[in-house]
A protein has these predicted regions:
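Short amphipathic alpha-helical segments
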Residues: 45, 147-151, 185-188
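Short, conserved active-site loop motifs that form the nucleotide-linked donor/cofactor pocket
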Residues: 29, 133-134, 172
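Conserved PLP phosphate-binding loop immediately N-terminal to the Schiff-base lysine helix
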Residues: 1-20, 29
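Short hydrophobic/aromatic beta-strand micro-patches
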Residues: 50, 152-154, 190-192
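Short, solvent-exposed loop/turn segments at secondary-structure junctions
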Residues: 1-4, 8, 36-39, 53-56, ...
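PLP-dependent enzyme catalytic core of the Aspartate aminotransferase-like
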Residues: 25-26, 165-216
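Conserved glycine-rich beta-strand-loop-beta hairpin in the small C-terminal domain of fold type I
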Residues: 90-93, 97, 110-125, 129, ...
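Conserved core segment of the aminotransferase class I/II
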Residues: 25-115
Length: 216
C-alpha cells in the first residue's frame, strides 16, 4: 500500500509531503511495490523490486558459497526472483510501466482509486468503537492512526482467538493478530469486501454482540 495515508496529500509527485521510506535511514534496502496494492491493478500479478545501489553490488560470503558468486542484486534477480516467478507477462509489465509513468508525470492520481478504503475504515471504526471495541494500534508517532485498508480491533476480556471465534457467529471474519507476530490481543480487520448496505447490518449485529458480552 503506497502513500495510502489520507491525513495528508501524498499524491503530488516530487512535492512534499512524501511517502515515508526506509531509504532515508540506510543504504541497504529493498523496496517491494505491488501493482495491485499501489494501483489497485486487477490484472495479472506484478510487482516492482527497488534495490539500492550499495546493496545490489554488495557481495556476501554466504551467497557466494551457495550460488558460486555474484552480488546480492544478481543473485536476487537471476536465482531468487526467477525461481519464484519465472518472470511475468509482457502485458502486465507494459501496464505497470504506463501507470508508473503517468503517476510520476502527474497525469494519473492513483490515490483517487483507493480513497474509498479510507472512508470504509472510518465508518467501520465508528461502529466498532461505539459498541465497546477499541483500536489495538491507534497511535502513529503521536498522531491518531490513519484510515486505510486495514485496522485493528480488540474487545475487553477477550483474547485474539476468542474474539475471532465469537465474531464468526455474528458474520464477521477477521485475522488474529497472533498470526501476524503481534504480542497484542486483537484482530486485523480488512475493509475490502464491505458493501454499502452492510453498515447497518454490522451496526445491528455489534449492538447484539455488546449486549451478549457486557464489559465488566
Amino acid at each position: 500500500y503506497f502513500a495510502m495515508d489520507f491525513r495528508q496529500d501524498l499524491s503530488k509527485p516530487f512535492q512534499a509531503p512524501y511517502q515515508p521510506s526506509v531509504a532515508h535511514y540506510t543504504d541497504y534496502y529493498v523496496l517491494l511495490i505491488s501493482g495491485s496494492k499501489a494501483f489497485s491493478y486487477a490484472g495479472q500479478r506484478i510487482g516492482v523490486s527497488c534495490i539500492s545501489d550499495k546493496l545490489y553490488h554488495r557481495a556476501y560470503p554466504g551467497l557466494t558459497q551457495r550460488y558460486g558468486g555474484g552480488t546480492f542484486g544478481t543473485v536476487f534477480i537471476h536465482r531468487v526472483l526467477y525461481a519464484l516467478s519465472s518472470g511475468t507477462s509482457h502485458s502486465a509489465q507494459y501496464a505497470m510501466a504506463a501507470m508508473l509513468k503517468a503517476a510520476n508525470e502527474g497525469q494519473y492520481n492513483f490515490l483517487d482509486e483507493v480513497k474509498v478504503y479510507g472512508e470504509r475504515a472510518r465508518r467501520l471504526k465508528e461502529i466498532f468503537l461505539r459498541h465497546g471495541f477499541h483500536l489495538v494500534y491507534d497511535n502513529d508517532l503521536g498522531d491518531p492512526v490513519a484510515d486505510g485498508f486495514y485496522f485493528t480491533i480488540g474487545y475487553p476480556g477477550m483474547s485474539s482467538g476468542e474474539l475471532a471465534r465469537e465474531l464468526m457467529y455474528y458474520g464477521v471474519s477477521a485475522i488474529s493478530l497472533v498470526t501476524t507476530g503481534s504480542h497484542q490481543e486483537g484482530l486485523r480487520a480488512c475493509t475490502s469486501f464491505i458493501q454499502d448496505h452492510q453498515y447497518d447490518q454490522l451496526d445491528e449485529r455489534m449492538a447484539i454482540f455488546a449486549e451478549n458480552h457486557p464489559i465488566q
